[in-house]
């Protein structure tokens, strides 16, 4: 096992992550260890990932077609990383390709632009989706949404109804593997079987799923095969700017590449262009070589830790957090609040403190406790409005305010999310902070910036230039 990537132990307060011992200033003076409850947004880098980057940099050169030693070594590392990614998701290499890009958003946009849609085609998606797995499809086909239940889960009966109602027109079922809002894990293989039964393919946004559970795309012809999977390294403890699309080759063998330029061609004249083979034809320009290698090392770390240990670690943290929240007056948890179900979901908990705006709760957690959370709608506006029971009339009123640059009343929740960097001590600190907020035991001087929808304190202005300079 690699140094810096040892298996997690919940009793330990820290794992070997870059910045795990960082101390941040507090409103009342002094500092506190930063408590990262924001892994659903992005993750800190594993120490072993940083070490892998350091190992590569002395040998870094551009990939492909270079004959120098450094170029050949970098090319070798880049392609070995591609192989590791394919193995990580269980891709059928005879029919699937691994394409590197910037992030999950770009991966799904690229698929939406390159997929061979026909007039009248339908993309079936759900109200649970992150905007990145909904907005790109609007430009490509008719989008039909599957409803969610009162508990925020995808309505399976509505899924079947809409697959049947649009049979023959549904080309893609585009779904999230796990919700970035409620942490629900979706039965994507079962949904793949249902989609394939009506002649559709399935796209899985695995941005939230990939760091926490194994993925098995399965072989071509398997009724439960996942045809397309997208995810990002920055959510997998390798925040160096890489996203991945693992795709059926057929969608990219037709037509011109999405991005054209150097490396995508075999030969160019003033009159003609001949594209090279996949995957190079879809990766024009110099790729993020360092980021790709970092992702491969992070994958190795996760596999060595083991998925059962990862799931057990995060389930213990999630159950402890839910139990603590249930004991605090005024805490409202959205979605499944049962600690007994922590093992069948991710450690993503949306909540509010009754009577306290979500933006104020997040500000107090940060300024007075050194806890990093996130608040708002998490790039899933329709889903959050649904679980908050926001009416259509309220929604239209809020839209008018936002378009007038007033975000003071935007609906939302606070989101605490856990990963391998967290310990039970982190949960305890979060619990003590929420107890204080529930009692209204926090500084009364916070001011709302209506245009940004954020609370700040006039007496607290950290000098970030002391921490980082270009």
Model-derived features with residue positions:
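Pyridoxal 5′-phosphate
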Residues: 1-470
